Every structure is written in structure tokens, then in C-alpha cells.
């Protein structure tokens, strides 16, 4: 009986320690991601990006972002924590409902065409 308990403990202890370290690693990664997200939202550059998103001219044929690509590159070099946010920012630009642009980013002629193309739900438009 004692031998059985010893052999079982040799089998289960590595498994339990492996699971424990996996769990610790998971919570550490979640904490690190949350910490970097908090840092990102406290950056003044985040305010600049959100104001740029709000200032996009919806009547324009293309997305006119109010800062140059060089300035964006300099922001990325100085604040690399913003890189994941920029993917979200780009997705927000594509999905922003603007006049002749649908919320999915493909052009429509007018709202009636949009209603015929997709099931129109006014609550989806911001």
C-alpha cells in the first residue's frame, strides 16, 4: 500500500506542479496585459489617437487622419505599447459608419441601398 502511494505521488506531483506553474504563468500574463493596457490608457498619445478617430471627416472619399505617417511612426517608436491598440484603431476606422460608408467599410450609394444590401438596424449606427 505504501509503495502504491509513493508511485502515485511520483506520477501526480510533476503533473500538479506543471499545472500550478501553467496557472501562475497564465495569471502573470493576464496581469502584465492589464498593466500594459492601463499604462496605454494613461498615455497622452492615447488621447491624441482617440481625438484623431473622432475628427475623421466622414464626408471625404478616403479616411483623412489628421496626422502624418511620419508622426505616427515616431509615436510607435517612442511608445511601443501602442502597437496592439493601433490594430484596434484601424479596425475602428474601417467599421466607423460615415455617411456613404457602411459600418463594414465597403461603400454604399445611399442608406436605401444599405437597407437592401443588409438587414438595416438603426441601433448599429452610432
Curated annotation (Swiss-Prot):
<feature type="topological domain" description="Extracellular">
    <location>
        <begin position="95"/>
        <end position="126"/>
    </location>
</feature>
<feature type="topological domain" description="Extracellular">
    <location>
        <begin position="1"/>
        <end position="9"/>
    </location>
</feature>
<keyword id="KW-0812">Transmembrane</keyword>
<feature type="transmembrane region" description="Helical">
    <location>
        <begin position="74"/>
        <end position="94"/>
    </location>
</feature>
<keyword id="KW-0472">Membrane</keyword>
<feature type="transmembrane region" description="Helical">
    <location>
        <begin position="10"/>
        <end position="30"/>
    </location>
</feature>
<protein>
    <recommendedName>
        <fullName>Putative uncharacterized membrane protein YBL062W</fullName>
    </recommendedName>
</protein>
<keyword id="KW-1133">Transmembrane helix</keyword>
<dbReference type="GO" id="GO:0016020">
    <property type="term" value="C:membrane"/>
</dbReference>
<feature type="topological domain" description="Cytoplasmic">
    <location>
        <begin position="31"/>
        <end position="73"/>
    </location>
</feature>
Amino acid at each position: 500500500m505504501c509503495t502504491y502511494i509513493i508511485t502515485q505521488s511520483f506520477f501526480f506531483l510533476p503533473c500538479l506542479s506543471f499545472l500550478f506553474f501553467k496557472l501562475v504563468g497564465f495569471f502573470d500574463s493576464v496581469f502584465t496585459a492589464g498593466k500594459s493596457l492601463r499604462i496605454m490608457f494613461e498615455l497622452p498619445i492615447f488621447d491624441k489617437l482617440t481625438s484623431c478617430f473622432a475628427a475623421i471627416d466622414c464626408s471625404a472619399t478616403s479616411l483623412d487622419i489628421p496626422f502624418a505617417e511620419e508622426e505616427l511612426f515616431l509615436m510607435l517608436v517612442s511608445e511601443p505599447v501602442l502597437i496592439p491598440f493601433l490594430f484596434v484603431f484601424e479596425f475602428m476606422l474601417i467599421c466607423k459608419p460615415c455617411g456613404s460608408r457602411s459600418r463594414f467599410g465597403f461603400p454604399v450609394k445611399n442608406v436605401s441601398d444599405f437597407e437592401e444590401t443588409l438587414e438595416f438596424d438603426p441601433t448599429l449606427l452610432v
